[in-house]
UniProtKB/Swiss-Prot annotation:
SUPFAM superfamilies: Carbon-nitrogen hydrolase (SSF56317). CDD domains: nit. InterPro entries: C-N_Hydrolase, C-N_Hydrolase_sf, Nit1/2_C-N_Hydrolase, UPF0012_CS. Belongs to the carbon-nitrogen hydrolase superfamily. NIT1/NIT2 family. GO terms for molecular function: omega-amidase activity. The keyword Methyltransferase does not apply. This is Nitrilase homolog 2. The gene is nit2. GO terms for biological process: asparagine metabolic process; glutamine metabolic process; oxaloacetate metabolic process. Pfam families: CN_hydrolase (PF00795).
Length: 328
């Protein structure tokens, strides 16, 4: 794209240099440089445009029927893609109830029907897909994980993120939930290059650990995506706060995509899926109902944030350091 313009610029420069030796040709020289300047401006505008893409977060209503849950997800993926989204995320546990008593019943292997359907949707729509999460059972070990499958625009699984930090909490008189009663924690990082930029994927409770977000940023991720299902206690208190905190801490985009609230479910999701930019500004959000949120992800604004407040060049590596023990 750039080579032809660069060669044109070189040729015109040589031509113009000779013209400078002839005062009668100054006007011709000026016109030549004006033309090249206009062409280079077009290149810069095209480059900037390439740094902008549309993201969609799908807040799905999830029930007890796995097949209906998956069909609902596919329908909304198709809708989001039709509306121009190039990167789409589903919520945590979108194909099953969020309950330790049902994870085993709803679990699938990585070549199961849910993954196949998501793969087909990503390929058909030519989009990158962060596949929320599903209960995944490992064929070899029989262990169950809370897993997010990530697909490229050819429908290929390019990464799977197994939830690293299991949601084990006990808030007196409010809520008790222990994923570790059924699930096994993952032990790997999930950073994927989608062409526009690198994204880092983690699940729900993972967002409470700033070290993970910092490591993802260190690995080059400029957009962190968290399929999550905060509840009616932690949601109002921390959902938005944590997203804006991770965004500002690392000067990245952050999206947290929740299931819609199901009044008949034993676990009540907070909803309020949200997209935040690198300045901590909310770009899009919603309420507790099923919906799709959209936002243009403009990487130019991220670069502006980092230029204005250059925390990366101001870190004191002589005093402290963050590194991963296990490499990606």
């Amino acid at each position: 794209m750039y080579r032809g313009l660069i060669n044109s610029f070189k040729n015109t420069s040589k031509f113009s240099t000779s013209l400078f030796n002839n005062n009668n040709n100054c006007s011709t020289t000026t016109k030549s440089f004006t033309h090249i300047s206009q062409q280079l401006r077009k290149v810069h505008l095209m480059a900037d445009k390439e740094k902008v893409f549309k993201f969609a977060g799908i807040q799905l209503l999830c029930g007890d029927n796995k097949e209906e849950n998956v069909q609902n997800a596919i329908k909304h993926i198709d809708e989001a893609a039709k509306n121009g989204a190039k990167l789409i995320s589903l919520p945590e546990c979108f194909n099953s109830p969020y309950s330790t008593s049902t994870f085993e019943k709803y679990s699938e292997t990585e070549d199961g029907e849910t993954v196949k359907k998501l793969s087909e949707a990503a390929k058909r729509n030519q989009i990158f897909l962060v596949g929320g999460s599903i209960p995944e059972i490992d064929k070899a070990t029989g262990k169950i994980y809370n897993t997010c499958f990530i697909f490229n625009d050819k429908g290929e699984v390019v990464k799977k993120h197994r939830k690293i930090h299991l949601f084990d909490i006990d808030v007196p008189n409010k809520i008790r939930f222990k994923e570790s009663e059924t699930l096994t924690p993952g032990d790997s990082f999930s950073v994927v290059d989608i062409g526009y930029c690198k994204i880092g994927v983690a699940i729900c409770y993972d967002i409470r650990f700033p070290e993970l977000a910092m490591l993802y940023s260190k690995m080059g991720a400029k957009f962190l995506i968290y399929p999550g299902a905060f509840n009616m206690v932690t949601g109002p208190a921390h959902w938005e706060l944590l997203q804006r905190g991770r965004a500002v801490d690392n000067q990245v985009f952050v999206a947290a995509i929740s299931p819609a609230r199901n009044p008949s479910s034993t676990y009540q999701a907070w909803g309020h899926s949200t997209i935040v930019n690198s300045w901590g500004t909310i770009l899009a959000t919603t309420d507790e109902h099923q919906s799709i949120i959209y936002s243009d992800i403009d990487l130019n604004t991220l670069n502006e944030t980092r230029s204005s407040i250059p925390i990366y060049s101001q870190k004191r590596d002589d005093l402290y350091k963050l590194d991963s023990i296990k490499k990606q």
